[in-house]
Curated annotation (Swiss-Prot):
The lineage of its organism: Archaea, Methanobacteriati, Thermoplasmatota, Thermoplasmata, Thermoplasmatales. GO terms for biological process: chromosome condensation. This is DNA/RNA-binding protein Alba. Pfam families: Alba (PF01918). Acetylated. Acetylation at Lys-11 decreases DNA-binding affinity. Binds double-stranded DNA tightly but without sequence specificity. Involved in DNA compaction. Keywords: Acetylation, Chromosome, Cytoplasm, DNA condensation, DNA-binding. The keyword Disulfide bond does not apply. Disulfide bonds: none annotated. One of its GO terms (molecular function) is RNA binding.
Amino acid sequence: MAEENIIFVGKKPTMNYVLAVVTQFNNNANKIIIKARGKTISKAVDVAEITRHKFIPDAKYEEIKLDTETLQGERGSSNVSSIEITLSR
């Protein structure tokens, strides 16, 4: 899969990411991966749901992956949850 078909969800407003997903589908992408970590996981789910229900009704969930990543910080290591949602049409 091309690197440009991956959307990393962060601190921006939810609709910015929805627009990015819709734009990728309109540019003939067959699959989009929405990735998020930690507190932004719920926003990634919102992005996928808004995209499916309001903009691209024929989009389907192809795969959902959950994982835990270990990050090294100043105070040692911490575990952070992550999600990858694959939408296709």
